[in-house]
Amino acid sequence: MQDWEKLLQDDYLEIAGRKFKSRLIIGSGKFKDFQQTKEVLEASGAEIITVAVRRVNITDPTKENLLDYIDPKKYLILPNTAGCYTAEEAIKTAMMAREATGINWVKLEVIGDQKTLLPDMEETYKAAKVLVKEGFVVLPYIFDDPVFAKKFEDIGCAAVMPLAAPIGSGLGLQNPYNLIFIKEAVSVPVIVDAGIGSATDIPPVMELGVDGVLTNTALAEAKDPIKMAVAMKYATIAGRLAYLAGRMPKRTYAVPSSPTKGVPFKG
């Protein structure tokens, strides 16, 4: 057991009663093939991988399937409703995924605009209400809006997934204060979704005290996805440890790091 493992041995990401050691979640899109997806997942140390039902053949056993490469006993396969633009589409997609896989978890995405891929909060909320009633563990992709985040918790969502920046933008964290407000507003896990561009974007997010971070494009479009996966693994750990350790206060003026008492020639 490494030093960081000892420090985090009792620290878990817990969603709907299920515990995960890793706070990094991987998206499965954009990789060149399923083999690379598997290698990146293993290198990242992640225990959850999201799967776009419309884009990966998890519902068609006659075609090559991501589940042929990833053991669902070892990882949580998290179907998502990427590509849906209405609550009705998202509900049907989630139902189809559950029927095909037996998985009742869903990362709920209802997109409001094709150019920005920002979420349609009204449609997402409508879909979430139905899916929660149907027995799903719902993790909605949302704006970094603390008011809406609380509404999603109130209807029974198991976590909320606010964006750091638009999907695939790689811009990194744009509004830390809203994420802090969301963390204060809800008691369910807050998992930052979208906008991560590199491993260096992760520690500032994790230091806010959020519970986890999801990334895909930053891995798939890296020059070396495996190395980036390893970097993100340790960036997530570093950010979490920094949050738990507690940073020093920021000050306007300098404070000497060495004692001045007894310094020669100092009056």
Curated annotation (Swiss-Prot):
InterPro entries: Aldolase_TIM, Thiazole_synthase_ThiG, ThiG. It is found in: Cytoplasm. CDD domains: ThiG. SUPFAM superfamilies: ThiG-like. One of its GO terms (molecular function) is thiazole synthase activity. Disulfide bonds: none annotated. The keyword Cytoplasm applies. The active site is at residue 107. It is an enzyme of class 2 (transferase). It catalyses: [ThiS sulfur-carrier protein]-C-terminal-Gly-aminoethanethioate + 2-iminoacetate + 1-deoxy-D-xylulose 5-phosphate = [ThiS sulfur-carrier protein]-C-terminal Gly-Gly + 2-[(2R,5Z)-2-carboxy-4-methylthiazol-5(2H)-ylidene]ethyl phosphate + 2 H2O + H(+). Its EC number is 2.8.1.10. 1-deoxy-D-xylulose 5-phosphate binds at residues 168, 194-195, 216-217. Pathway: Cofactor biosynthesis; thiamine diphosphate biosynthesis. GO terms for biological process: thiamine biosynthetic process; thiamine diphosphate biosynthetic process. The keyword Coiled coil does not apply. GO terms for cellular component: 2-iminoacetate synthase complex; cytoplasm. Keywords: Cytoplasm, Schiff base, Thiamine biosynthesis, Transferase. Homotetramer. Forms heterodimers with either ThiH or ThiS. Belongs to the ThiG family. Catalyzes the rearrangement of 1-deoxy-D-xylulose 5-phosphate (DXP) to produce the thiazole phosphate moiety of thiamine. Sulfur is provided by the thiocarboxylate moiety of the carrier protein ThiS. In vitro, sulfur can be provided by H(2)S. HAMAP family: ThiG (MF_00443). PANTHER family: THIAZOLE SYNTHASE. This is Thiazole synthase.
